[in-house]
Each structure stands twice: as structure tokens, then as C-alpha cells.
């Protein structure tokens, strides 16, 4: 989850795998090397008091974990801020804004995860990753990411943020992602609205990589109609 300073659009680098003209991916989907987490006994009860004390290790005077606290938190748990596991964690905490955790979000989410310390959270990493492999959970995470990354005074995602978040969520699983990224790079679009965002996921799940089953009369957003037209021209040129 990119650390966001003063709620500006995140500076996450776009992730695209070795396609011509694309930037090198700086988004990691793996945790940094770290010492093995201390084994946590299943009988060790969750402590709300301990969880709150853990929160205050990172929170500022406003009782919010902000950019500096988030950076320290990521360092302590051994995860890069841009790692997709941070997005899944934010989803579990129901965090409203990228780069920030409120006390209420922390307590509610960590209680749900039964985590009151670094070691317990590290022991839940496999569970958090598993949410990405569940079709329903991934769809919820994907939809959550739109509002999470969006500037709250805007109804749409700026296109750079959209590209970065799409790279994080679909870059390793959608065969057409790098082509779609190229299309967005040269397109006239400067923002992506919620309907477009939702439909990109549906498109990635249902349309073949060769576009052979794309229904031109379907209820796809114009953005995707234009992408298909652009790609077909490239294929025949």
C-alpha cells in the first residue's frame, strides 16, 4: 500500500513486465526477507489493551497512523508499503484513505484478525494472501481499491493512480494487462470512473486474450470498446 503524504495521489510506480516502451515495475508482490516470526500459541488470547498500545507505537497526536507511522509499521512487519498485502490489510481494516489508519479502523480490523502485535500479524500473512485467490474476496478487494486510492474530493481516479493500482491488482494475472497499460499510456483518458474500473475486472475475467469473444454490442464502457478497436488495428498492421 503506497505511503501517501498529505493525501495526494500515491507515487506508486507502474508495474509492467518487460513490454517494450513500458516502465520497469517497482511494485513488489512479495515481502522483504525477514527473520522467522516468533511462533504464536493458539491459546494466547487477543488483548484489546495490547492492540491499542501497539497502535500508539505508530500513531501521531491526532490518533491516526499517518505516512511516517505507516512507513515504520511496514518496516517492523517486514513488508514494503507498495506490497499488495498492505492493500489486503487495509481492506480488512476497512481503511478509508490510503496511507492512513485511524484508531477505530485499527481496533476493529485487528480485532477481526485477532492480532495485537507484530508477530501475530506476520503469522496471518498467508491468510491475507489467500484472499487474493478467492474469486469473491478478490472482487471485493478490487472494488474497495477504487475508493481507497481515490482523492476524496474527486469522484474518479486520476489515470496514473488507476494504472498503478491496476498493475498491483492485475499485472501478474491478466495476460492483456501490459497491452491495456500501453493503451492507457497513449489514450486521451485522464481519469477512470467507477463504472470503467469495475468493468476492467469483468473484461479481464471474461474476454479472451485474442479478443475473439468480445461482444461489440455488449454493455461495455466506451473506454473498453476503444481499447479493443485499438488492439485489433495493431494486430492487423
Curated annotation (Swiss-Prot):
<dbReference type="GO" id="GO:0006974">
    <property type="term" value="P:DNA damage response"/>
</dbReference>
<feature type="domain" description="DCUN1">
    <location>
        <begin position="46"/>
        <end position="232"/>
    </location>
</feature>
<dbReference type="Pfam" id="PF03556">
    <property type="entry name" value="Cullin_binding"/>
</dbReference>
<dbReference type="GO" id="GO:0001558">
    <property type="term" value="P:regulation of cell growth"/>
</dbReference>
<dbReference type="GO" id="GO:0031624">
    <property type="term" value="F:ubiquitin conjugating enzyme binding"/>
</dbReference>
<comment type="subunit">
    <text>Part of a complex that contains DCUN1D5, CUL1 and RBX1; this interaction is bridged by CUL1. Interacts (via the DCUN1 domain) with the unneddylated cullins: interacts with CUL1, CUL2, CUL3, CUL4A, CUL4B and CUL5; these interactions promote the cullin neddylation and the identity of the cullin dictates the affinity of the interaction. Interacts (via DCUN1 domain) with UBE2M (N-terminally acetylated form) and probably with UBE2F (N-terminally acetylated form).</text>
</comment>
<dbReference type="GO" id="GO:0032182">
    <property type="term" value="F:ubiquitin-like protein binding"/>
</dbReference>
<dbReference type="InterPro" id="IPR042460">
    <property type="entry name" value="DCN1-like_PONY"/>
</dbReference>
<dbReference type="GO" id="GO:0005819">
    <property type="term" value="C:spindle"/>
</dbReference>
<dbReference type="GO" id="GO:0045116">
    <property type="term" value="P:protein neddylation"/>
</dbReference>
<keyword id="KW-0539">Nucleus</keyword>
<keyword id="KW-0963">Cytoplasm</keyword>
<dbReference type="InterPro" id="IPR014764">
    <property type="entry name" value="DCN-prot"/>
</dbReference>
<dbReference type="InterPro" id="IPR005176">
    <property type="entry name" value="PONY_dom"/>
</dbReference>
<dbReference type="GO" id="GO:0097602">
    <property type="term" value="F:cullin family protein binding"/>
</dbReference>
<keyword id="KW-0597">Phosphoprotein</keyword>
<dbReference type="GO" id="GO:0005634">
    <property type="term" value="C:nucleus"/>
</dbReference>
<dbReference type="GO" id="GO:0000151">
    <property type="term" value="C:ubiquitin ligase complex"/>
</dbReference>
<protein>
    <recommendedName>
        <fullName>DCN1-like protein 5</fullName>
    </recommendedName>
</protein>
<dbReference type="GO" id="GO:2000434">
    <property type="term" value="P:regulation of protein neddylation"/>
</dbReference>
<dbReference type="GO" id="GO:0005737">
    <property type="term" value="C:cytoplasm"/>
</dbReference>
<feature type="modified residue" description="Phosphoserine">
    <location>
        <position position="41"/>
    </location>
</feature>
<dbReference type="GO" id="GO:2000436">
    <property type="term" value="P:positive regulation of protein neddylation"/>
</dbReference>
<comment type="function">
    <text>Contributes to the neddylation of all cullins by transferring NEDD8 from N-terminally acetylated NEDD8-conjugating E2s enzyme to different cullin C-terminal domain-RBX complexes which is necessary for the activation of cullin-RING E3 ubiquitin ligases (CRLs). May play a role in DNA damage response and may participate in cell proliferation and anchorage-independent cell growth.</text>
</comment>
<keyword id="KW-0206">Cytoskeleton</keyword>
Amino acid at each position: 500500500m503506497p505511503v501517501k503524504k498529505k493525501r495526494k495521489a500515491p507515487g506508486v510506480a507502474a508495474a509492467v513486465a518487460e513490454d517494450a516502451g513500458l516502465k520497469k515495475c517497482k511494485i513488489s508482490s512479495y515481502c522483504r526477507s525477514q527473520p522467522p516470526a516468533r511462533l504464536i500459541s493458539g491459546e494466547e488470547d487477543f488483548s484489546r489493551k495490547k492492540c491499542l498500545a501497539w497502535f500508539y507505537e505508530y500513531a501521531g497526536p491526532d490518533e491516526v497512523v499517518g505516512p511516517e507511522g505507516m512507513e515504520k509499521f511496514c518496516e517492523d512487519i517486514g513488508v514494503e508499503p507498495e506490497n499488495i498485502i498492505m492493500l489486503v490489510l487495509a481492506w480488512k481494516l476497512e481503511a478509508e484513505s490510503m496511507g492512513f489508519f485511524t484508531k477505530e479502523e485499527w481496533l476493529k480490523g485487528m480485532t477481526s484478525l485477532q492480532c495485537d502485535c507484530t508477530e501475530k500479524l506476520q503469522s496471518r500473512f498467508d491468510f491475507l494472501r489467500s484472499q487474493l485467490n478467492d474469486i469473491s474476496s478478490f472482487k471485493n478487494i478490487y472494488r474497495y481499491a477504487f475508493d481507497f486510492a481515490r482523492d476524496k474530493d474527486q469522484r474518479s481516479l486520476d489515470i496514473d493512480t488507476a494504472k498503478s493500482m491496476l498493475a498491483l491488482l492485475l499485472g501478474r494475472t491478466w495476460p492483456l494487462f501490459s497491452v491495456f497499460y500501453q493503451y492507457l499510456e497513449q489514450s486521451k483518458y485522464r481519469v477512470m470512473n467507477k463504472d470503467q474500473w469495475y468493468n476492467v475486472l469483468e473484461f479481464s475475467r471474461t474476454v479472451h486474450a485474442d479478443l475473439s469473444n468480445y461482444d461489440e454490442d455488449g454493455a461495455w464502457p466506451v473506454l473498453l470498446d476503444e481499447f479493443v478497436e485499438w488492439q485489433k488495428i495493431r494486430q492487423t498492421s
